[in-house]
Amino acid sequence: NTGYAALSKDEDFFMDGGSKVQPDSKDVVETNLAGISDILKSQNADFYFLQEVDIDAKRSFHINEREYYENALDMSSIYACNFKCDFVPYPIPPIGKVEAGLLTMTDYQVESAKRIKLAESFSWPIKTCNLKRCMLETRIPIEGTDKELVLINFHLEAYDSGEGKKMQSQMLADKLQEEYQAGNYVIAGGDFNQTFEGVDKYEIHDTDSWVPGTVYKEDLPEGFDFAVADNAPTCRLLNGPYSGNYEDSQGYVIDGYIVSDNLQVDQVQVIDTDFEYTDHQPVSLRVTLQ
C-alpha cells in the first residue's frame, strides 16, 4: 500500500487520530514516489500489487502516480479505480478531488484483466464520497498448459463497523474457490485491513485508536492458506509521525497474501523500510508452481 505517496514517516492522518489531510508540499510526494520506486526496483519482482495509487488527487498534488511508476520501473500496469470523487467535503480543509485505485504491474503476457466490484460498506449519502472497494483480477497464461496464474489485488474496507470487511472477505473467498476449482494457480494479495490468526507480535497500545479485526484460516476455502510474515509490521498507525520504534508507534500486520496449495511458498517476508516513504511496508512473496 503506497499511501498515495503522501504518508511518509513524518506525516499523520486525521482519520487515525492525527490532524493532517495532505503533506505540506509537492516535494514530499515527489520524494516519496522516488523512494517507493527505488524499493520496488530493488525487489526485481515479476509482479507488483500496489494499492492507494493516485491518478489525479488534491492530496498528492495531482501527480499521475500510475504514470510515474510505469516510467520508473519501465513496466506495464493494469489499473482499477476504487475512489473517484470530484470533491470530498471533509474535514477542514477538505480532501477535495480524488481519483485513485489499485495497480498491478508486470511485463508478463496478460491474457485478460478486470475490475470486480466488492460489497459497499456505506449507504447514501456517505457512499457518494467514499471508496468503492474492488478486486483487480489479472490472468497470466501458463505455457504448455490450459491453466492460468490468477492474480487478485485488493484493498478491503478500513473504517467501517466490520460488516463491510466481512462481506468483502466472503466475496474474495468465493472468487478464490471458483478459480481453484477451475484448476488455476491463485495468488491474492493486498491490504486486508485485518490482522491474521496467530499473528500478535505487535501489541495494541491503545484500544481507543484504530484496532484491526482478525481474519481466520477457517474463513478461507479449502486448498488455500495465508502467506504472511511478522518480521516487521506492515503498517503503522498515523496518529503522529513515526517514532522510530514500535513501543511508541503502533504497528500492525495487515498486509499479505492468500495462496492456493498448488503453489509452493518458498519465502515470504516484510521488507523493513522503517516507514520512510509510506505508512505501509511491502511484503515480498516467492512461490514455485507445482
Please tell me what each predicted stretch does:
Residues 1-71, 75, 79-90, 94-99, ...:
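N-terminal, active-site-proximal structural segment of metallo-dependent hydrolase catalytic domains
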Residues 1-22, 114-116, 137, 147-158:
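Active-site-proximal beta-strand elements of phosphoester/diester hydrolases
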Residues 19-25, 53-55, 119-127, 154-163:
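Surface-exposed cleft-lining segments at the edges of enzyme active sites
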Residues 71-73, 97-113, 139-141, 248-264, ...:
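Conserved beta strand-loop-helix elements of the APE1-like EEP
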Residues 86-149, 153:
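A well-ordered secondary-structure block
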